Every structure is written in structure tokens, then in C-alpha cells.
Amino acid sequence: MSQIFSFAGENDFYRRGAIYPNPKDASLLLSLGSFADVYFPPSKRSRVVAPTIFSAFEKKPVSIDVLPDECLFEIFRRLSGPQERSACAFVSKQWLTLVSSIRQKEIDVPSKITEDGDDCEGCLSRSLDGKKATDVRLAAIAVGTAGRGGLGKLSIRGSNSAKVSDLGLRSIGRSCPSLGSLSLWNVSTITDNGLLEIAEGCAQLEKLELNRCSTITDKGLVAIAKSCPNLTELTLEACSRIGDEGLLAIARSCSKLKSVSIKNCPLVRDQGIASLLSNTTCSLAKLKLQMLNVTDVSLAVVGHYGLSITDLVLAGLSHVSEKGFWVMGNGVGLQKLNSLTITACQGVTDMGLESVGKGCPNMKKAIISKSPLLSDNGLVSFAKASLSLESLQLEECHRVTQFGFFGSLLNCGEKLKAFSLVNCLSIRDLTTGLPASSHCSALRSLSIRNCPGFGDANLAAIGKLCPQLEDIDLCGLKGITESGFLHLIQSSLVKINFSGCSNLTDRVISAITARNGWTLEVLNIDGCSNITDASLVSIAANCQILSDLDISKCAISDSGIQALASSDKLKLQILSVAGCSMVTDKSLPAIVGLGSTLLGLNLQQCRSISNSTVDFLVERLYKCDILS
């Protein structure tokens, strides 16, 4: 054996003979023949040089992988149906890319073979958010939905790290001819080329939404306009490279357009709005113009050509003056207008708003917010002119006082059903009474939210003026006392929201429940710290159909919860006791008793309720959504 290992240098080899003294043991490690050459470097461990031995274990390439992509493409497009193509697509990314790149017109299927799924064409919808939005997923969706009715609705919400590009939209465009709705949010990696693919392959597209798509220009929108004549809804927001040219193409080619919303697109000017309105006079029903660089000209066009508009939203139009609203109202084109929303437009003055009221005789709903130049005179004039008005909401109109509020109530006619005041800081308490014959019998809903000057005298006047109220919302009115609330006790109240009214007492709740026990369905007294268990006892005794009760941050305890559970009449579906520190684990049996009808339970910030109790309720009340 010593001769075997007595090598002088790198060129020494041992030929012929077994490496190990026992060939049977050696065969367990290496199948070396008696003629294998072995080289032993002097300073390294021995290694075997036998390339021909291990070649038998190498993975041989599959024969079909030898084919170039062109040949595979020809094979895939001749498969008999979408299921077969889908099965092939999920073999590898290479095959998926090839299958998803096949246009519908390139599919070569014998005429005797028909594909199923025509009855529910375009019935599927898919949504990709954030990191899930990738080209591979889009390709898989395109191929996978082809054999199951076809993709009808696609929404892509990207992120800064999104890996979706034109390649993904190419897959959709070539494989989903039934696509009817496409929504793209925050996808800066998609360009006009992606929309060109959609335009070429998805001629049935009806709804298009582009939000923060900074790389899409007029070119992409023009392509959509030319190839998708059935487009009915268009939404553009924060698309910095889309302007008048794209809107002009849409107006000329999409005669069925019914809804347009454009927000924060700096290149959209009067010319684009004018072309849009003048070419869709008979079809356009909903129009939203927000934060645009348009002037009085656009509003004049709206007033003249908006013959079919029923819903109009104007927001943040800083370059529109009083003249614009005056001309819009006098254009007599908005005869069908049903709903009007105006927000943060400096041109809303008394004269402008009165003109709009006169020019829209069929308007039923109006929302006016953030209009610092609107005063009592303008509001009352608008109310007189709007003979069909059923709902009026004012928000952050700080020049409107209590005189404008009551004046509009008295002059809105017999159709006004809902009135809302939100954050109007000039509202104060009445110091003079209203005429004895005054009434507003049609009003059913009144909402006064966060108007700190609104007090008891106003509520007393409302109690006399509006005897048929059903829905009362007095959120955040800390200046109202017990006597003020008692003026509003009607016999038909259905929904009550007194959240944040710190002066609300048990006496008021007892009086309300005793008078409205057979009609009250919703009661919200969140944050009314003077409410105790006595109110819950009254609720349990009087309320027959109450379904939603919010007693968060009230001074209630376990006794109050037990009182609710003891009522045979009460069938609560929603109960909130968030922030009630005196409600403890002792209320567990009572809550379980209420749980037979509960669908929602809020136990957040109930520090005296242990986690084990919450876990038990989650397990026991399996039909109820529990927040803790």
C-alpha cells in the first residue's frame, strides 16, 4: 500500500488497481472501473476526475424547449380553445408571455369548433392593489379569464414600487375583448402605448378611469376615443399631461357619453370643456369639474349646452367669477338639472346663486359649501327661486346667520324635506319670534352640526315651525340645554343623533322614548356624559323597534346593560358602548342575551372588559361583528 501513495508531484498518477482495499465498499461511493485515472495533489484532498461518469445524471433539455418562440406561438394560436391555451400558459413564464401576446384575430381555430362562455361574456371582474399589480399577474388574468366568460372589469391601483407596465396592459388588450371597465390609479409606469393596446383590442370599453397617471397623454385618450365608440363614463384626475386635445377627440367620437368627471388636470381649459359639452348635448347627464383652470366661459357653455345634465358638481374653480354663475343660470339650458353641488368657488355670490336658482326650475337637491361671499339675502333669494327644492345643505358658509336659515325655511315652499347646516359659525340664537302663521310642514330631516351659536331659542322655533320632523341630527351643539331639547319632542321621530351634546340629560331621553317608542329606530347619544343607566331603563321599557343604539362615552354601568337585556321588546342589531369604563365583565350574560339579534357590537376602549370576555363573545356571537 505504501507504493500507492508515494507520489512525487503534480504529474504522478496511479493507474490500474483498486483505490480501496475492499472494492465492494468502494462501490457504495463511486462506481469506478479498474481503469479510472486519479490525481492526488500533494496539498489538497483527493478528487476524482471522471466527467464521463456524471454525464449520465445531467438533465437533458425537453425537446419542445428547443423550439424558438415563433414556433411555440404558432402552436399556441392553433389550440382548439381557451382552456387549452390557459393550461399551456401556466407551464412557465415564457409560455405565459407567448400565450398572452396572441391577439384574438390571430387565433386559428377550425370553424367547427366553437368556444363556450358567450352567454356570460365579460362577467368577471379583477382588482390588483399595490405590490400585487404586476405584468405577470395581468398576463395570468388575461389568459385565465378568457375561458370563463371573459374579463369585464379591471381595476389597477399601483404604488411607488409597482411592477406593472405597458406589457401587462398589452396582455389585457390582446386577450380580453369583452373588457367594459378599466380603472388605473397611480401607475406612472403605464404610458400611451398601454392605452393603445387597450384601444386596439377592447372595442367594447364603456368606462375609463385614469387617476394620477402622469405618463399618459392626449395621444392615449385619442386612441381610446377612436376605437371605443361605446364609452359612456370618463374619469380623469391628476393626469398632468391630458388636455383639450384628448377631450375634443372624446367629444367627437363618443356620442354615448353620459358621465364625465375631470379633477386637477392643469392642461384642461375652456376649449376642452366647450368641445365636450357642445358635442354631447343630448347624452351627457353627469358632469363634475373640480380644481381646473377654466373661466366663466366654461360655465356659460354648461348653462347653454347642458340640456341633458341632471347632476352637476363644480368645485375649486378659482378662476370663475360671479359673472360665470350668472351666465350659467341665465343660459336656460339646465332645465333637467336635479342635483347641484358647488364647493370652494369664489364666484358664488348672492346674485350668482339667485340666477342659478331661477335657471334650474327642476332642481331638487343643492349643496353649497365653502362660499364666503354668500349672505342671508342670497340664500333666501335662492330658496324663493328654487320652487322644486327638496334638500338643501350649507357647509362653511360663514356669512349666513340665523335669519338666512329661518328665511330659507319659510321660503322654500312645500317641497323642502331636508335641511342641513354644517360648520356655519355666524349662526346665533333668535332674539325675535317668528310669525304665528309660519310653518314648514314638509320638512322631515333637520341636521345642525358643529354650529356653536345654535341655542335653545332656535330649537323652540323649529319645534313650532316643523311639526313633522322624523330625522334630527344635532351633533356637537354644546350650547343647547335640557329645555331646548324638550322643544323638539315630536310624536314621529325615527332617527335621533345627539352625539357630543354635553347638556343632554336622562330626563330628555325618558321624554323622547316615552313619546316616540313606537317609531324610534336609531338613537345616537355618543359622548353625552350626563346620560346614566336611567336612560337605558327608559329605552328598554318604551322602545319597540329600536335597532341601532350608540351609548359610547356615557356614564352607564353593568346595570344599564342588564336593563337592555331584560326587555322582551328590544331587538337591537347595532350596539356601541365604546369608552364606557363602568361596563365590566359582569355584563357578559346580558350581552350574550342581546346577541341573539346583534349584528354589530363596539367594545373599543372598554378598559374594564377583559380580553377573555371579548374572546368568549367573539366565539359565542359568531354572527356579530365585534370591535374591541
Swiss-Prot record:
It comes from the Eukaryota. Induction: EIN3-dependent induction by ethylene. Residues 61-109 form the F-box domain. One of its GO terms (biological process) is protein ubiquitination. Keywords: Ethylene signaling pathway, Nucleus, Ubl conjugation pathway. PANTHER family: OS02G0200900 PROTEIN, PARTNER OF PAIRED, ISOFORM B-RELATED. This is EIN3-binding F-box protein 1. It comes from Arabidopsis thaliana (Mouse-ear cress).
